[in-house]
């Protein structure tokens, strides 16, 4: 678990404002392989809860609320380290990913690549769960 000795929120620049919420960009990366799993936003509360619990929390810009990654699916991210960029407006969460990071069922949200004028599923993309079994048909 990540231990914080103080309020790291004052060290960061929550300068990305979406719908009145001050946010930082958060990149989740597999702590062993370096694979980029997902990109999301964090507000101050999401960062605080992440540091206190050792599990990734994010701010949903579409739902306008805090969410624990994996709260519906069980596919949580255990945070091993937090890196901060030079401007203090983005973090990389080095995580141990349980199951898939992407709501589409893939291990990573970055399962497609650009091929000419098309998006193609990468040959090495790994689908680890069926989203309909977890989320229903929506």
From Swiss-Prot:
Its EC number is 3.5.4.19. One of its GO terms (molecular function) is zinc ion binding. Binds 1 Mg(2+) ion per subunit. Binds 1 zinc ion per subunit. Mg(2+) binds at residues 85, 87, 89. GO terms for biological process: L-histidine biosynthetic process. Its main location: cytoplasm. It catalyses: 1-(5-phospho-beta-D-ribosyl)-5'-AMP + H2O = 1-(5-phospho-beta-D-ribosyl)-5-[(5-phospho-beta-D-ribosylamino)methylideneamino]imidazole-4-carboxamide. Zn(2+) binds at residues 86, 102, 109. It is an enzyme of class 3 (hydrolase). InterPro entries: PRA-CH, PRib_AMP_CycHydrolase_dom, PRib_AMP_CycHydrolase_sf. Its cofactor is Mg(2+); Zn(2+). Keywords: Amino-acid biosynthesis, Cytoplasm, Histidine biosynthesis, Hydrolase, Magnesium, Metal-binding, Zinc. Signal peptide: none annotated. GO terms for cellular component: cytoplasm. It is found in: Cytoplasm. Pathway: Amino-acid biosynthesis; L-histidine biosynthesis; L-histidine from 5-phospho-alpha-D-ribose 1-diphosphate: step 3/9. Catalyzes the hydrolysis of the adenine ring of phosphoribosyl-AMP. Homodimer. NCBIfam families: PRK00051.1. Belongs to the PRA-CH family. This is Phosphoribosyl-AMP cyclohydrolase. It comes from Methanothermobacter thermautotrophicus (strain ATCC 29096 / DSM 1053 / JCM 10044 / NBRC 100330 / Delta H) (Methanobacterium thermoautotrophicum).
């Amino acid at each position: 678990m990540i231990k914080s000795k103080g309020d790291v929120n004052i060290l960061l620049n929550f300068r990305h404002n979406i719908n009145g919420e001050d946010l930082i960009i958060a990149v989740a990366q597999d702590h062993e392989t370096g694979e980029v799993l997902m990109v999301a936003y964090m507000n101050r509360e999401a960062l605080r809860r992440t540091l206190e619990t050792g599990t990734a929390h994010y701010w949903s810009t579409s739902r306008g609320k805090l969410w624990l990654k994996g709260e519906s699916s069980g596919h949580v991210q255990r945070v091993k380290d937090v890196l901060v960029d030079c401007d203090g407006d983005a973090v990389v969460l080095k995580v141990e990913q349980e199951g898939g990071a992407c709501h589409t069922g893939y291990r990573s949200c970055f399962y497609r690549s650009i091929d000419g004028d098309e998006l193609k599923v990468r040959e090495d993309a790994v689908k680890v769960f069926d989203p309909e079994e977890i989320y229903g048909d929506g």
